[in-house]
Amino acid sequence: MITSEEIKRRLWSGANDLRGSMDASRYKDYMLGLMFYKFLSDKTLETFQATAGLPKEADLVQEYSQAYEKLGENLTGMIQEVLGYYVLPEHLYQSWVKDIRNGDFELQKVMDSLNTFERNIAVKGDADDFKGLFSTSIIDLTDSALGSDLNKRSKNIKDLIFLFADLNMVDLQDGDVLGDAYEYLIGQFASSAGKKAGEFYTPRQVSEVMAQIVVKSSKIKSIYDPTVGSGSLLLTVGKHLTKNDQRDLHYYGQEYITETYNLTRMNLLLHGVRPEKMDIKNGNTLAQDWPEDPERPDEGVQFDAVVMNPPYSDQKWNKREDKPLKVSDPRFADFGVLPPDSKGDFAYLMHGLYHLGQKGTMAIVLPHGVLFRGGAEGEIRKRLLEKNYVDAIIGLPSNMFTNTGIPVCVMILKKNRELSAPVLLIDSSEHFVKIGKQNVLREKDIAQIVDTFVNKTETKGYSHLATREEIIANEYNLNIPRYVETLDNEIVQDVDAHLLGGIPTKNIADLKVLNSSVKDVLDESLTPVREGYVKLNKSVADLTDEVLEDERVKNKSIKVATKIKDYLHDYWQELTTVDSETELENLRQAMLSDMKQILATFDNIDVYSGYQIIAEIWKNTLTHDLELIAGLGFYNAGRTREANMVTKGTGQKKHEEQTGWIGAIVPNDLIAQNLYAEQVQSIANLKNKLTETEGSLSELVESAKTEDSDENVILYDLIKKNKDDEPQDSFDNKKIKAELKNVDKGSTDYDLLKKVSSLMNQKTKLNTEIKNEEKALEGAVYERIEKLTDAEIDSLVYQKWFGGLKAAIVNLVKEPLKNELQTLDTLNERYATTLSDLEEETKKVESEFESLLSELVVR
């Protein structure tokens, strides 16, 4: 069984190997297009199998071909009634694979297959859902970028076809494995394409923020993205709905770029969205307002949710059509002004707002300039605020997008806000981790944004609820720093403390965690030196020991540990009995939510750090393992081993080879450490001896390099040299053996040479023993995987998933205490040396200098 992560790695590795020098933004159309055609072929065969009542082991390609010869259009018509499309037997993806294996492959057949598919669906009502997906303007198999001649192009396409050949796209569609792999590839292509990716990709973390906020704000049956790109925003919103609500959800979107428009349709279909539940249009969103209600032409169709990531500061927003838009356009009329020609940000916002239902929620990504720029944009912003549409503004980190490094914000808009409701401003610009070239929101950053929005909480330095009066006082300027003060963690220097010594008591009062947790311990460690200043009467190291060993801290740690133990006990049964991949996301969300609730009951613990720990466990182990458990069962998965494939060679010789076996969910190293502890210790002992031996040899080499030493005279010529005759870091064993024959036994030379020879022999012997014992241990582990008992699997998997969890969460109790103790140490060092100390030191140096001068004799 293959997991989603393994599919992603395999496909992206294949893409990198196959695309050569072709631009990533172009190659994606070929790869994703053929991946989608494989899906269409597999769905055709699955529908035929179900309709014909054939068993799973049937040769579906052969059965389908024979049935088509008998029934012809009656068969394909029946399949089309179910799917909205069909692929003819001779044009199945599987027929390409068969031709390749038989040596009969022709590139023309692929082109014919793609063209025939489009012709066959053109006469049906679902034609718009598939029209143009495989047009030659998108997938041009004659493009020289695929190869300089027909043979090279044919080889490259054959390799690409084989990349998907053994994947059952129908099986992978269950649990969204296929859709997730497709989205992953889009993201990877976007990362590789850099600035060229801007038109089709919104980073997953930004989509998550927008989707979670929208879902928690409205009851959603229809969703619209006017600049839909790859469709990831629409799908992310859908993912956060219940299964029943997902089935009822209708997806709408519009996209200007044809290639990107195709990505959307394929993406939705691969995620299991039925054609009748999606309406995607290829066109200019602003110039061609869509969708329209024929019965209410001046109102436009309204949706429960609107999400979008439009082009930033689009300078051509009103120049792409013959007739420029006017302020009388119903989308803009309420505002009485058009955005400036050079910046189309508000044009997209007003378009989306026009299509937002009265009880709906809109989330849009915008550059920060819309928050404070004047002129027409200032007037539009004022109207938005006067109409009470702006619900929240979320400032995100810079450099999150592949196509721009500028910081952006997410604006949330609603039409049904209470008149007195404030505007929430969140500054999350410093909450991220850097991965490669991009800044990325962590799971905890997303959770904190969403929780702050839902609960409308104010946090110093992070969020603020701005009243109407505040906003008017700021002349409708919504620049986030005007409302959310950036926290400066640098402690202000105290002049008196520098002059006279002592730590300011106001700085001690700022140690909130120490004061609220162990105030008496802190107070006892301080001695007053004068009013407003104290000094430490013990080292910070001793104070740290006292604080961490205090009964209150230890009891709190025990309570937290007990809560975590109960938490894991409650979820263990669910995790080990999961039987459907569709359950995983709900289970993940439940574990994350419960961890937040548990930690929120304790003071001075960073709830979101605990949240991130659970998120990382899911990312690193649980998602992979639970996919296998859902398909195989817990104990069967525990006793399953897989070939350990490693990549060897480079260039055309690059290939994969099996080197042993690995446990599907139970790691080999855990089996070794827990069930073969004696063997592991024996190998460790041998490695320690090897390290000692190598150390002794290294010392002799260094001595031999030292001129005028006995070792230099005897051993220097026996050190290995490079081509420039420079000594290296080891002896030449052949020269050592030869030299031993030339010296007298019992001589100093002989004893030293014998010592080197013995050490080298010992090193060789130890290496051999280590290799043999490691090989024996590996073999034992390979055999043991399939023989693990249920109890062993319970213990080993628990250790793998949660072995370090309790300690990591308990550390959240100690971490804020340690941070403040570090601050105290910094303050102590800062004010340890006073002005009088410096003056005294200066006098001492001057006195020593004068003494030296007096000793000088002038001759």
Give the residues covered by each predicted segment.
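Non-catalytic, mostly N-terminal accessory regions of nucleic-acid modification and defense proteins
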Residues: 1-209, 214, 219, 282-285, ...
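Conserved NTP-handling cores and scaffolds of large molecular machines
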Residues: 22, 38, 44, 185, ...
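Flexible, glycine-/basic-rich loop-and-beta segments that form/coincide
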Residues: 402-480, 484-500
